[in-house]
From Swiss-Prot:
It comes from Macrococcus caseolyticus (strain JCSC5402) (Macrococcoides caseolyticum). Belongs to the universal ribosomal protein uL1 family. Signal peptide: none annotated. The keyword Zinc does not apply. This is Large ribosomal subunit protein uL1. Keywords: Repressor, Ribonucleoprotein, Ribosomal protein, RNA-binding, rRNA-binding, Translation regulation, tRNA-binding. GO terms for biological process: regulation of translation; translation. Gene3D superfamilies: 3.30.190.20, 3.40.50.790. PROSITE patterns: RIBOSOMAL_L1 (PS01199). SUPFAM superfamilies: Ribosomal protein L1. The gene is rplA.
Amino acid sequence: MAKKGKKYQEAAQKVDSTKFYSVEEAIKLAKETSTVNFDASVEVAFRLGIDVRKNDQQIRGAVVLPNGTGKTQRVLVFAKGEKLKEAEAAGADFVGDSEYINKINQGWFDFDVIVATPDMMGEVGKLGRVLGPKGLMPNPKTGTVTMDVTKAVQEIKAGKVEYRAEKSGIVHAAIGKVSFDADKLVENFNTLKDVLAKAKPASSKGTYFKTVAVTTTMGPGIKIDPSEVRN
């Protein structure tokens, strides 16, 4: 295992690995312990009491964070006719149909999110083996397969983030940048937490929010007191 650098070691010394912090404390500490020379992302990890092998316990969705993510998302929209014009007017970076399918097949990935109208999914679905592993396949659960392309594009541009529980039941998501005021990050954190709480499967028994941690890009992990997020 590679040894962590000096900056990381110094940052890690500011974090008490035996302590559970309040949400506010953890986020302030995450900002203080960022070790990189760019505006790092602030990320959270919720370990949930779910079994994703069960169909009714697979958690996936999207939420618009009130203060955005600080990241500019490049949006590609697959649509036809008037929907192309709507997507363009809403601020989509790329709009089209078959020509972009051909470009993707040739290795083009200069975008972050795909939105598609339902009538385009027959064609877009053929890209499953290319888009699926990259997490780029549009999905109705995240609002990226829709006839309302205007709303979809505007929400993504406003700071919409997708979330999905991994095999271990962990949901990772970025809630902003180190440059954000701490209270803005706390507000984004609470918005995501509330959405995850509402998404709790009825069949999930026992503790739902098992562990919660916050970190920055390449920064140390900071544990949050689970009692602060449990309903």
